[in-house]
């Protein structure tokens, strides 16, 4: 009895080095609805009359029925299944959005649990796994949520619900609780930027309306960031969470609490270390500046933190750090500047000396900033000695003529600020260079003598008498 022919293994299983582009194309074909559910048979929803077509006395009950109908989830992975019912749910959601926006008296106490239930049924789900080795958020297209035609309207409805003049947090807090917020925060890892944008608005509204949830929300964002920095280095919604935090920090009362200062130093500063910094750096820098505008005394720990995590091998990140540093210097108090000027300008001197012209250029652009120039001028007796040797050397040796031109402008500015010290430093630099050249010449002569001596010994060993 012959056995049935075996199917050869697929390429996926045997080729561990299949081309990334092929794997990505295959991924795209199989993407991506986290709303996937196997349907045994077509879903049938009983059509209900439009809310505007029934008497106002019947609208509250019909509103609840429509909310319950919208709890039914469809399989958007199968583009041909339940087309009529998918369209019916979409039109019902649209109707609910309009109704909650226009109608008065629609938010009764009975509607709150049904609204939260409908929203929860639709948005809370396990997100599809994202292989961080495969997906590069800087280069690759994100995986879009297939069920977005429904999901978008659910988010739109929920935002209108939260923004309604009739919305009562005292009733809603029974249903929008810590568990709800925790599930909401998990959704920020969605690859779909459209969803993260809606989530940002939703969380912001919840933070504004539920005073009892504020500390919990901050703590959970803190936990997400710590896990991101020290464990996973993968979370899609960092930029959006930082954007929300920017508004939250702006509203902090003074004096700042110890927990807020700790969040800055222990969480926000270490966020600079991750590889994907470019995806959220603008929002991170904004948060840092907000803190410093609230409490200038935090300037020193922030600057020292940036110096500690300054990139050693990534020029792109160095340029970002320099940009952020300029934003900080734009709001720095002169009294705080004095405390950090030495370590700061030692780092700037290194950047100016960088062989990577974009790093050097970005550092030299500081001298185009009027406020920074005024700070430098007030403290030129400290800053000029730190910067001088690097600037003078670059003016003679740098490979890029554009950088040399910028350096000449900086040297000219320093000369106008403090001509006496400039002349002294120039004389000292030239004297030091002459001394170095003399030592170098002596070293070369010594090596030449040693080589000659070794050569003579070799000749004697070979029986040749040198003349």
UniProtKB/Swiss-Prot annotation:
GO molecular-function term, one example from the UniProt record: protein phosphatase activator activity
Biased amino acid composition, Basic residues: 20-29
**Residue span of region Disordered:** 1-40
Point to the regions of Low complexity compositional bias: 30-40
A single cellular component GO annotation? cytoplasm
Where do the coiled-coil regions begin and end? Answer: none
Description of post-translational modifications: Phosphorylated on serine residues.
Task: Cite the entry's keywords alphabetically.
Answer: Acetylation, Cytoplasm, Phosphoprotein
> Which residues in this protein are found as Phosphoserine?
30, 32, 34
Q: Does the keyword Phosphoprotein apply?
A: yes
Modified positions (N-acetylserine) are: 2
* Pfam families with a match to the protein in the record: B56 (PF01603)
Q: Which domain of life is it from?
A: Eukaryota
Phosphothreonine PTM positions read 7
Q: Where in the cell is it found?
A: Cytoplasm
Biological process GO annotation list? signal transduction
The record's function comment reads: The B regulatory subunit might modulate substrate selectivity and catalytic activity, and might also direct the localization of the catalytic enzyme to a particular subcellular compartment.
Please describe the quaternary structure of this protein: Found in a complex with at least ARL2, PPP2CB; PPP2R1A, PPP2R2A, PPP2R5E and TBCD. PP2A consists of a common heterodimeric core enzyme, composed of a 36 kDa catalytic subunit (subunit C) and a 65 kDa constant regulatory subunit (PR65 or subunit A), that associates with a variety of regulatory subunits. Proteins that associate with the core dimer include three families of regulatory subunits B (the R2/B/PR55/B55, R3/B''/PR72/PR130/PR59 and R5/B'/B56 families), the 48 kDa variable regulatory subunit, viral proteins, and cell signaling molecules. Interacts with SGO1.
The family classification in the record reads: Belongs to the phosphatase 2A regulatory subunit B56 family.
Recorded protein name is Serine/threonine-protein phosphatase 2A 56 kDa regulatory subunit epsilon isoform
Q: Which organism is it from?
A: Homo sapiens
């Amino acid at each position: 009895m012959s056995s049935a022919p075996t199917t050869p293994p697929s390429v996926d299983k045997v080729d561990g080095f299949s081309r990334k582009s092929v794997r990505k194309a295959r991924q795209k074909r199989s993407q991506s609805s986290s709303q996937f559910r196997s349907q045994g048979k077509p879903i049938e929803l009983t059509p209900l009359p439009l809310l505007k077509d029934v008497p106002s006395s019947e609208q509250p009950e019909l509103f609840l029925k429509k909310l319950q109908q919208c709890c039914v989830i469809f399989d958007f992975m199968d583009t041909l299944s339940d087309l009529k019912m998918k369209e019916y749910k979409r039109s019902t959601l649209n109707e609910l959005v309009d109704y909650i926006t226009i109608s008065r008296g629609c938010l009764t106490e009975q509607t709150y649990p049904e609204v939260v239930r409908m929203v929860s049924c639709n948005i809370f789900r396990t997100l599809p796994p994202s292989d961080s080795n495969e997906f590069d958020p800087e280069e690759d297209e994100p995986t879009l949520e297939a069920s977005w035609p429904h999901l978008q309207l659910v988010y739109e409805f929920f935002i209108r619900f939260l923004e309604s003049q009739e919305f009562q947090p005292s009733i809603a807090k029974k249903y929008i609780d810590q568990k709800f917020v925790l599930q909401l925060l998990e959704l920020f890892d969605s690859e779909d930027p459209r969803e993260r944008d809606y989530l940002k608005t939703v969380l912001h509204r919840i933070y504004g309306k539920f005073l009892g949830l504020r500390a919990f929300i901050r703590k959970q964002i803190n936990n997400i960031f710590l896990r991101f920095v020290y464990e996973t280095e993968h979370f899609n919604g960092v930029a959006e969470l930082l954007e929300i935090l920017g508004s939250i920090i702006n509203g902090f009362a003074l004096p700042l609490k110890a927990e807020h200062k700790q969040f800055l130093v222990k969480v926000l500063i270490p966020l600079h270390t991750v590889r994907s910094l470019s995806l959220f750096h603008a929002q991170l820098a904004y948060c840092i500046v907000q803190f410093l505008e609230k409490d200038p005394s935090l300037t020193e720990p922030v600057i020292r933190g940036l110096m500690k995590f300054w990139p050693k091998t990534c020029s792109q990140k160095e340029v970002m750090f320099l940009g952020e540093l300029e934003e900080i210097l734009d709001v720095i108090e002169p009294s705080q500047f004095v405390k950090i000027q030495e370590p700061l300008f030692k780092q700037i001197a290194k950047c100016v000396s960088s062989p990577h012209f974009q790093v050097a250029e970005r550092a030299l652009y500081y001298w185009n900033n009027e406020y920074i120039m005024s700070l430098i001028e007030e403290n030129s007796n400290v800053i000029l000695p730190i910067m001088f040797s690097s600037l003078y050397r670059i003016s003679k040796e740098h490979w890029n003529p554009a950088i040399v031109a910028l350096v000449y402008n900086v040297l000219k500015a320093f000369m106008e600020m403090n001509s006496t010290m400039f002349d002294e430093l120039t004389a000292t630099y030239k004297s030091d260079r002459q001394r170095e050249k003399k030592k170098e010449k002596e070293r070369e002569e010594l090596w030449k003598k040693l080589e000659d001596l070794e050569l003579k010994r070799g000749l004697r060993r070979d029986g040749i008498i040198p003349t």
